[in-house]
């Protein structure tokens, strides 16, 4: 499958937000609170997603945005400033397992060099955990945040440069 990766433009914001909504639903359908998903307001979700102003790369297939990755300096690790974070990686379901997510992640890793990179994954999202492990991320921490009235198990995964860049 042919695709290109480029930086998000202002004109892309709505399409990116729509991908965020659609892929969020398909990803979390089996692990989120059904009441929350049933009451998820698409317009409100898209509006909120469109407002994010972090570095974002989009994947394009046939002039359509099919996925994105959002990353930047982390705010969750205060002991040093040599960490970046992947905040979101979403692909429409039909475009998963075509190396697009891998290419987005590799490009984000290049753009955050020389920082180490961290991210958080819901523990039940085993597909994502396996994907990140294949790239070289390792589970380093667990926490139990509460979203929408439900407590989740989250795994912090780190990509440490010294292990990968020799």
Predicted regions and their residues:
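Acetyl-CoA-dependent GNAT
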Residues: 3, 7-13, 17-94, 102-111, ...
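A general secondary-structure boundary signal
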Residues: 60, 96-98, 130, 155
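C-terminal "cap" of GNAT-fold acetyltransferases
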Residues: 82-84, 115-118, 122-129, 134-135, ...
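Active-site acidic-Proline motif in GNAT/NAT acetyltransferases
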Residues: 92-98, 123-124
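Short coil/turn segments at alpha/beta junctions that flank glycine-rich nucleotide-binding fingerprints
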Residues: 98, 114-115
């Amino acid at each position: 499958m042919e695709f290109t990766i480029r930086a998000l433009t202002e004109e892309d914001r709505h399409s990116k937000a729509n991908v965020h909504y659609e892929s969020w639903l398909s990803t979390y359908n089996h692990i989120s609170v059904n009441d929350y998903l049933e009451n998820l307001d698409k317009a409100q979700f898209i509006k909120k997603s469109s407002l994010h102003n972090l570095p974002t790369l989009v994947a394009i297939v046939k002039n359509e945005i099919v996925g994105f990755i959002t990353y930047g300096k982390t705010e969750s690790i205060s002991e040093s400033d040599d960490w970046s974070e992947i905040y979101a990686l979403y692909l429409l379901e039909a475009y998963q397992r075509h190396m697009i997510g891998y290419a987005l992640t590799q490009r984000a890793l290049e753009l955050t060099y020389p920082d180490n990179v961290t991210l958080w994954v819901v523990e039940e999202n085993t597909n994502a955990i396996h994907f990140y492990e294949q790239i070289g991320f390792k589970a380093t921490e667990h926490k139990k945040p509460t979203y929408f009235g439900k407590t989740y198990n989250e795994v912090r995964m780190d990509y440490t440069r010294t292990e990968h860049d020799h």
